[in-house]
UniProtKB/Swiss-Prot annotation:
Single GO molecular function: translation release factor activity, codon specific
Protein name listed in UniProt: Peptide chain release factor 1
Disordered: annotated span: 281-302
A single GO cellular-component term on record: cytoplasm
Domain of life: Bacteria
Modified residues (N5-methylglutamine): 237
Purpose of the protein: Peptide chain release factor 1 directs the termination of translation in response to the peptide chain termination codons UAG and UAA.
InterPro entries given in the database record: PCRF, Pep_chain_release_fac_I, Pep_chain_release_fac_I_sf, Prokaryotic/Mito_RF, RF-1
Main localization category: cytoplasm
Classification via Gene3D superfamilies: 3.30.160.20, 3.30.70.1660, 6.10.140.1950
Gene (name only): prfA
PTM: Methylated by PrmC. Methylation increases the termination efficiency of RF1.
Keywords assigned: Cytoplasm, Methylation, Protein biosynthesis
Amino acid sequence: MKASIVAKLEVLVERYEEVQALLGDPGTISDQNKYRELTKEYAQLEVVVLSFKKYQSAQNDLAVAEMMSDDDDPDMREMAKEEIKEAKKTVEKLAADLQILLLPKDPNDDRNCYLEIRAGAGGDEAAIFAGNLFRMYSKYAESKGWRVEVMNSNASEQGGYKELIAKIDGEGAYGIMKFESGGHRVQRVPETESQGRIHTSACTVVVMPEVPEAEAISINPADLKVDTFRASGAGGQHVNKTDSAVRLTHLPTGTVVECQDQRSQHKNRAQAMSVLQSRLQQAEDEKSHAEEQTIRRSLVASGDRSERIRTYNYPQGRVSDHRINLTVYRLNEVLEGDLNALHEPILLEDQADKLAALSQAEF
């Protein structure tokens, strides 16, 4: 392991001991917010520090075994040879584990997220596909124990959605779902196609982390245009007699958010404001990370329509992820919410990218 990485670990050990002392300080205990933050930091550091101590212990075992290899007794030398072999394996494994623990973590990964699905090229068929995607994500969320709440939807007459915004509540939701951002393409024969021709349609998916109220971007009321209107449910299931739906327009950026799935204007406005703040925060983050993205390719797409990440081919029963050249012939399972076959390889690829960057970094 690089000396610079070992030095980084030694700094973390010092910080771990410092936090440990602070947690026993009466002044810290009396400040609940500070105590909560330090407790969280301590738990994160403890995993790394304990792993580093195991690594140091394994290094010592290896050094002792190497000393034994110079012994005059041939039996001792043979035993040392076996111990060196095992100790090297242990050291390599622990070094690899430590490097993974040191990978930079996205502070948003543990947060809830907003899911936006928009039908693109393909007309009614694209809207139907948007409905398929939302059903897929809903089933996946259910399997993870997450809760999905539709915040705004624009249903298509032929089925599916022209546009849909939902919130996904659950631990680690954004950390996994963020890899779904980008262009999704479907190739299949529409039910209305009499000639049996395969059509290609597309949808855009955008996943944004929910921004906690304390960290939310401050929006000047003068920069906000608020419109209210009457809302109707999917397929016209209900029509409110009051103007409960809310449309917010952020004038400086032209960002527009609508929410109408709650019966109360107050709730719709609160939800719309939360989505707007998340969109503005994401735009700010993308801008600040632009330079980094040119240096290291990112598997998390920006949600640009032209950035196609996945194709769902019905005739062949396959799903292809174009970011990592992965194809799985499990279309039905994927559409039923089994996304593990797609998520696990891309998470590993993202981890490999970060490890490569770590190995080149100087601390």
